Amino acid sequence: MFPSVQINALNQLSGETKEIERHALFVGVGTTNQGKLLALTPDSDFDKVFGETDTDLKKQVRAAMLNAGQNWFAHVYIAQEDGYDFVECVKKANQTASFEYCVNTRYLGVDKASIGKLQECYAELLAKFGRRTFFIQAVQGINHDQSDGETWDQYVQKLTTLQQTIVADHVCLVPLLFGNETGVLAGRLANRAVTVADSPARVQTGALVSLGSANKPLDKDGNELTLAHLKSLETARYSVPMWYPDYDGYYRADGRTLDVEGGDYQVIENLRVVDKVARKVRLLAIGKIADRSFNSTTSSTEYHKNYFAKPLRDMSKSATINGKDFPGECMPPKDDAITIVWQSKTKVTIYIKVRPYDCPKEITANIFLDLDSLGE
C-alpha cells in the first residue's frame, strides 16, 4: 500500500442558530406599499412605510415598537382592503421569512370560522416548514354609540359567545378596549428586557405604553369599563389589560390562548418556551439523520441524552445579583429530562421534559399580631 495522509475538517454542527423568538409579522390594511413585505426597526420612517394617515395598522405597529423597547425587529405586510385575506398574507410572508407570531390588526369579519382558520394556518406552517407560529387576532371594541350601541354586559356576552367551543392553542384573541391592545401585547412579547418565559402580566416589566386612550372606555350608557368586565373577558380566554386600584399605570392580565380547559398551553409563556425548545431540538435531530454514532448502545444513549438536553441547559442559564435570582427560561434538566426509545433499527423516539419555573399570579399575604411575646 502506498502511504498517504488525509486531513478532514469535520463540521460538528455546534455553532449558533438564528433567533426566531420575538420576531413578529404585522398584517393589516393600508394604501401605501400595498402587497409588500417590509422590515421594521425603531429607526424606520413610519410615514414612508405606512403613509401619513394614521391607519389601524400603523397605530398598532407603533404601539408594538414602543412597548418592545430596544433592538425591536419586525416585518409588516400591507394588504388591500378589497379581498383582504390574513391567512394568505401570512403564507406569502413565510416565503421570505419566518416568524414567532403573526398579528392580524384587522378586526372586521372576525367570527368562529376565521378564528379556526388561524389554527389551521399554524398547522399548515408546521406541516410544510416545521415552523411554530402563534397568532394574535384583534377583536373589535365596544360600540358606544348612544342610539345603537352596546352596554358592557352585552359586549362581554357577545365576546364570550364568540370564543365558545373553539380550541386553538396557538391563537390569542385581543379585544380593542382602549384601542391599541393588539400592538401593545405584541410589543410586550418582543421586549428583550425579559425572556420568552415571562408572562405579559409581569408588573416589573413596566406599565403599558401607548394603550390608545388615557381614559377608560365607555359603553353606550356612558358607563366606564370596570375590572369586573375585564375579569369576565379574561375568564372567557381573552387577553386584556388591567389596572390595580391606587397603583399608577395600566398593566396586562395573562396572555391567554384558546387552549382547552385544563390544557398545558392556556397561557402564552408556556407555549413560547415549548416552541423554542422544539425549534432547537428539530435542528439537532436533523443533524443526526443517518449518523450511525447515534445508536442503541449504552454509551451512545448516554451521549445523546446529553446532546438533546443542550437546549434545556442553554435556556436554563440564570444569574444571581445581590442575592436575587434571575431565572432562565426553564429549570435545569435533570437526569430524567431526556428519554430515548428505539422502536426499530432505523426509528427512534425522543421524549424531552421541560420544567417551567413557578410564577406568582395570585398572592395572598396574611398579617397577624403577636400579643404573647414580652419585651424584645
Swiss-Prot record:
It comes from the Viruses. It comes from Haemophilus phage HP1 (strain HP1c1). InterPro entries: Phage_HP1_Orf23. This is Putative tail sheath protein.
